């Protein structure tokens, strides 16, 4: 069944189909994620609006049983800053892929759509893309059926203490209950504290974020552990982010040599 709708929409990715056509995966606010067919994409009037990480209002023919079609568009927002920086673009691509993996196609999820687009808008504004990604990863866990409490000890329910995380109990332990899990994570107390903050933070109150490099690295490693143990997905875009550390080191070495 085909129906015409107008909706705010974000392009997740596109891929070549046949000689000059494209299949475009788009997350729409009203109709969820859909695959669109664009004929003669290179010279199509739709070319500006089918590029990855492009936000626009689309007039669409949505098909519940097959490919959908874009009829017209307006208010294109291309995220220029993101697309001009390899590192930011990698993180933006990853959060988009994570959103794609978190819900079935054709399932409307206006809250997730708003969360994803706001994450990209804050990256575009220049807020720390790594920390924004961490916040996104933590808050989207519920879409994968994962609920973790970083706020209170799983045994005594006290708050505001130097917690450590236990995979055995899927929650945090206070110092009095560290003994309950010999294989607890031995995290820096700032890590559970920050994850508790990330779970609760609202973007409307977020003006600036800044963390030391070693804390950011520990956050990255621990969130990776959470996704490995509880979610079990392995996205190509995440593997690319992991490889960026090597590229960053190469670029820094080159800059240091040129400055000597």
UniProtKB/Swiss-Prot annotation:
DNA repair keyword on record: yes
GO biological process: DNA recombination; double-strand break repair
Keywords from the UniProt entry: DNA damage, DNA recombination, DNA repair
Entry keyword Translocase: no
Listed InterPro entries: ARFGAP/RecO, DNA_rep/recomb_RecO_N, NA-bd_OB-fold, RecO, RecO_C
Stored Gene3D superfamilies: Nucleic acid-binding proteins, Recombination protein O, C-terminal domain
GO CC entries: bacterial nucleoid
Family that this chain belongs to: Belongs to the RecO family.
Function comment: Involved in DNA repair and RecF pathway recombination.
Protein name in UniProt: DNA repair protein RecO
